[in-house]
Amino acid sequence: LKKTVVNEAVTNGLNPNVPMNDSGVEWLGKIPAHWTTIKLRQILHPFSEKNHPELPLLSVVRERGVIIRDVEDKESNHNFIPDDLSGYKMVKKGQFAMNKMKAWQGSYGISNYTGIVSPAYFIFDVDFENLEYFHYAIRSKVYVNFFAQASDGIRVGQWDLSINKMKEIPFIVPPEDEQKAIVEYIPVAFAKYDNAITKLTEEVETLHELRNKLISDVVTGQIDVRDIEVPDFEYVEETEDTSDVDELDEDVEANDEEV
C-alpha cells in the first residue's frame, strides 16, 4: 500500500484533474502534461574515493535504503567483512549509493551518512535540488522496473546493472513546488495507513478476546446454551488466503542487509 502511494505520487502527482500526456515510455504511461523527463545521466555523476577504513561501514537494505551496518549482528551479516577496508568506497551524506548486483530489487538510495561500502557498489554525486524527492521517486516501483530492464545476467540472482543502460533511464521531473508538496504528502499518507492498521489490529484483538471469553463462559457454564437452537448450515471447507499477507510482506520485508 505504501509503495502504491509513492508510485502514484511521483508519476501522476497529487492533482487528479490536471491534463495528462503520454510520456513516450511504456513503463511510465501518461504523466502530467506540465512535467518533464530527463535522463539519469543528467542527474547522476560517478564518484569513486577509497582509503577511508576509519569511516563506519554502511549497507543497503531494500526497504530502508542506506543504513549504518551493525557489524556485531552476526545473524544479519551474511557477507564476509575483510580485515582491510581500505579498498572500500567512500559514500558522503547526500550521495547516491547502489548495489549494482541488486539494483533490480531496489537496493539503492540517497545516503544520510558518510561511510564506506563494498567496492562492488556504484556511488554517484546527485545533481538534483530536492534530494528527498529524488530518493522517494527513484525508489518507487516504476524505477525498480527500469533498473531490472537495465540489468544483464544468466540468472536472476546474478544480474549486473549496466551503467550505460542506466544512464539512459528517464526520470520524471515535476515543478519544484510540486516536488515539495509530494515530499510533505507521503509521510502524512504513510501515517494514515499506519494508524488504520493499528486500529484494525486492535479491533481484531478485541474480537479475539470477546470470542475467547464467550467460549470460556459457555464451557464453564456461566452461559446456559441448552435451550439455544442450532441452525442448519452447509459446511464449507476453508482455504488459506495469503493475498493480503503477501501484499503486506512487500511493505515489511526482512532487513536483508547487503554489502
Identify the residue ranges that each predicted region occupies.
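Sequence-specific dsDNA recognition surfaces
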Residues: 24, 41-93, 239, 251-259
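Positions in alpha-helical segments
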Residues: 23-26, 38, 119-122, 132, ...
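Non-catalytic DNA-recognition/assembly elements of restriction-modification systems
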Residues: 22-53, 168, 176, 180
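Short, well-ordered beta-strand elements within core beta-sheets of diverse protein domains
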Residues: 26-30, 79-82, 122-126, 167-173
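A cytosolic small-molecule/anion-sensing beta-strand core signal
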Residues: 35, 92, 219
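Amphipathic alpha-helical coiled-coil/heptad-repeat segments
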Residues: 1-17, 173-259
